[in-house]
Amino acid sequence: MSDICDANKLKHRFRGYFPVVIDVETAGFNSQTDALLEIAVTLLKMDDEGLLGIDKTLHFHIEPFEGANLEPEALAFNGIDPTNPLRGAVSEKDAFLEIFKAVKKAQKASDCHRSIIVAHNAAFDHGFVSKAIERCDLKRSPFHPFATFDTATLAGLAIGHTVLAKACIMAGIPFDNKEAHSALYDTERTAELFCYIVNRWKTLGGWPLLATSESEDMDSEE
């Protein structure tokens, strides 16, 4: 029983990694040259039954870094006007200092030793986040430098679809395409999808794994 209770702690679910769901909106596809315009970060928590859920979300509009490229097609797609003063945009550095503070606090509270980015098509978001952190010369990032959890891959395995909107609907998660391509909306839907997949795997008996010692005991009894 104690082993099962221990497995229900977040620190043991992903080998000490604290999952942080992230979505970014950008002014193009090139993380080195194109502006990061919006970021949302959803922190997760695990209940006493070992079920994963949303804790809270941070959201920032970002000022384009100096010399950043702004692709017109990307701006038309996400509907962001970087010059609009009503965005209340902050610098990359200010945003990431707040993100680091919140992530490290939640990571510590969960007894995890590092955080790992969860995102839909995670290589894209991870690339922009990593490049922004590098530009800001921020040290001691809580995020793993290359490992991620990609919900496109996980959804393809667990649900049979890789498109965020369709995967959410198939999982019973409401999705409004009119709200899509907002970092705030997309990260919370991605978080719900990730939690659904992790919790579904648990309810189907995939977690916790049978302890090695228990397996050996069963073999000896046979």
From Swiss-Prot:
Which one of the record's GO molecular function terms can you name? Answer: 3'-5' exonuclease activity
Requisite cofactors:
Mg(2+)
Check the record and name the SMART domains matching this protein. Answer: EXOIII
Cellular component terms per the entry's GO annotation: cytosol
> What's in the keyword line of the UniProt record?
Exonuclease, Hydrolase, Magnesium, Metal-binding, Nuclease, tRNA processing
Name the positions where Mg(2+) 1 binds. D23
Q: Subunit info?
A: Homodimer.
Which protein family is it in? Answer: Belongs to the RNase T family.
The entry's protein name is Ribonuclease T
Organism this protein belongs to: Shewanella oneidensis (strain ATCC 700550 / JCM 31522 / CIP 106686 / LMG 19005 / NCIMB 14063 / MR-1)
